[in-house]
């Protein structure tokens, strides 16, 4: 049968190890203070009003006699009566002598209370965890961070955008080379063809004896000078394209500069357009907040790229191309 005094045997090893336990004061308070909450029984409300038709042996609530003290609708059962050794007769015992069915329930409550008490003592008697050096913890954290690979981490929805390398079509490559040759021939002056024609005519003339050696040398010098001058002087079409590119670049730069200036001016006007009438003052005369309008800070998600695995917010509303 449950006995509250049996805690004395269980507390001897606990008391011997109090000096080595960091929670010695708490353990001593737990075992030295008696908790009588498990002995409390609720009083029948109908019995208090004089309307309960059941006897004290049938009602599951207590029917205390007049000599028992009732506090907040509850009474405390006599522990000696539960053990069968209460001898208080004059004056009568101020605690409840419960019937058998309430006594059985109180014994169950006592066993549960003792088990909880022993579990709490076991938890408090455990040796404390060793203190962790903060410098060692920081070093371990830095080592764990260095183990993370520096390669970027791509989400799964980026895999469809990375296509494998496709072999080039030989017919397409030949067509591209032909287009490049024709463009080069169009943009550069036709000096090579003229030189080839003149060299052919000179060879034919030398064969027929029409040109002398001096005329041939003069012809070769003139042709080389003409070729050098043609290389230094670009074609009119190429000069026109360069001029257009410079004009477009200057126009775009001026447009962007003017747009940025207008945007900044609008922001400044919007920030100072509605001044406050007067600042709110505290009881001591200090302002609660500044009456000057603060400029809004623009959020830049790319400032967080120093974090490993960070991917800026992107829109995925586009149609993904079909796989090849």
Swiss-Prot record:
Q: Which InterPro entries match?
A: Znf-CCCH_Muscleblind-like (IPR054429), Znf_CCCH (IPR000571)
Assigned GO CC terms: cytoplasm; nucleoplasm; nucleus
As for subcellular location, the record says:
Nucleus
Organs and tissues of expression:
Expressed in neurons around the pharynx.
One Gene Ontology term from the biological process aspect of the record: regulation of RNA splicing
What superkingdom does the record give? Eukaryota
Which key words are in the record?
A: Metal-binding, Nucleus, Repeat, RNA-binding, Zinc, Zinc-finger
Query: Which family, according to UniProt?
Result: Belongs to the muscleblind family.
Query: What is the protein's given name?
Result: Muscleblind-like protein
Gene encoding it? Answer: mbl-1
């Amino acid at each position: 049968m449950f006995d509250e005094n049996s805690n004395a045997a269980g507390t001897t090893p606990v008391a011997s190890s109090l000096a080595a336990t960091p929670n010695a004061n708490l353990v001593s308070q737990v075992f030295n203070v008696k908790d009588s909450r498990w002995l409390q029984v609720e009083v029948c409300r109908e019995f208090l009003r004089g309307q309960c038709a059941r006897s004290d042996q049938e009602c599951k609530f207590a029917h205390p006699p007049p000599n028992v003290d009732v506090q907040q609708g509850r009474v405390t059962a006599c522990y000696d009566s539960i053990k069968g050794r209460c001898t208080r007769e004059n004056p009568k015992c101020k605690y409840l002598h419960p019937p058998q069915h309430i006594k059985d329930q109180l014994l169950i409550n006592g066993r549960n209370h003792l088990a909880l008490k022993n579990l709490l003592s076991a938890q408090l008697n455990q040796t404390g965890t060793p203190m962790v050096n903060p410098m060692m913890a920081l070093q371990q954290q830095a080592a764990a961070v260095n183990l993370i690979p520096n390669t970027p981490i791509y989400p799964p929805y980026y895999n469809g955008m990375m296509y494998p390398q496709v072999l080039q079509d030989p017919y397409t490559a030949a067509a591209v080379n032909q287009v490049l040759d024709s463009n080069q021939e169009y943009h550069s002056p036709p000096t090579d063809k003229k030189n080839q024609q003149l060299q052919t005519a000179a060879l034919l003339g030398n064969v027929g004896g029409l040109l002398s050696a001096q005329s041939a040398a003069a012809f070769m010098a003139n042709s080389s000078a003409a070729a050098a001058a043609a290389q230094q002087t670009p074609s009119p079409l190429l000069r026109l394209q360069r001029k257009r590119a410079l004009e477009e670049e200057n126009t775009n730069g001026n447009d962007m500069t003017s747009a940025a200036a207008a945007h900044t001016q609008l922001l400044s006007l919007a920030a100072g357009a509605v001044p406050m009438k007067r600042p709110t003052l505290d009881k001591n005369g200090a302002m609660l907040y500044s009456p000057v309008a603060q400029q809004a800070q623009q959020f830049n998600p790319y400032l967080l790229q120093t974090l490993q695995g960070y991917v800026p917010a992107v829109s995925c509303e586009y149609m993904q191309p079909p796989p090849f």
